[in-house]
Amino acid sequence: MGRAMVARLGLGLLLLALLLPTQIYCNQTSVAPFPGNQNISASPNPSNATTRGGGSSLQSTAGLLALSLSLLHLYC
């Protein structure tokens, strides 16, 4: 009974670690509407939101994976 619960917890943490970076990525790429009194420039914005935050989300994914694997190794 205890091993099954720990295995489910580990798989849940792994699933959360895989889905969390996609949620962060989707929130960063949302586009806000422009106010009517501003000019829209044709040049692209150099600080693109898709290039930020990739390392930290990968690092948190690796950390959660290591935590879940260590819990599985400890209890199973």
Curated annotation (Swiss-Prot):
Biological source species: Mus musculus (Mouse)
Observed phenotype of the null mutant: Cd22/Siglec10 double-deficient mice develop autoimmune disease, which is not observed in single-deficient mice.
UniProt xrefs under InterPro entries: CD24 (IPR028029)
Q: What's the family? A: Belongs to the CD24 family.
Question: What protein name applies here?
Answer: Signal transducer CD24
State which tissues express it.
In lymphoid, myeloid, and erythroid cells.
In the UniProt record, which is one GO cellular component term?
cell surface
Instruction: Indicate which residues are glycosylated according to the record.
Output: N27, S30, N39, S41, S43, N48, T51
- Mark which residues the record calls propeptide: 54-76
Disordered, as annotated region: 37-57
Q: Which Pfam families match?
A: CD24 (PF14984)
Topology versus the membrane: Lipid-anchor; GPI-anchor
Q: What's the stated role of this polypeptide? A: May have a pivotal role in cell differentiation of different cell types. May have a specific role in early thymocyte development. Signaling could be triggered by the binding of a lectin-like ligand to the CD24 carbohydrates, and transduced by the release of second messengers derived from the GPI-anchor. Modulates B-cell activation responses. In association with SIGLEC10 may be involved in the selective suppression of the immune response to danger-associated molecular patterns (DAMPs) such as HMGB1, HSP70 and HSP90. Plays a role in the control of autoimmunity.
- Lipid attachment residues per UniProt (GPI-anchor amidated glycine): G53
Keywords, in A-Z order: Cell membrane, Glycoprotein, GPI-anchor, Immunity, Innate immunity, Lipoprotein, Membrane, Signal
Signal peptide range equals: 1-26
Q: Where in the cell is it found?
A: Cell membrane
In its record, the post-translational modification comment is: The identity of the N- and O-linked polysaccharides is not reported in PubMed:1530634. The O-linked polysaccharides on Ser-30, Ser-41, Ser-43, and Thr-51 are probably the mucin type linked to GalNAc.
Polar residues composition-biased segments: 37-51
Q: Share an example GO biological-process annotation for this protein.
A: cell surface receptor signaling pathway
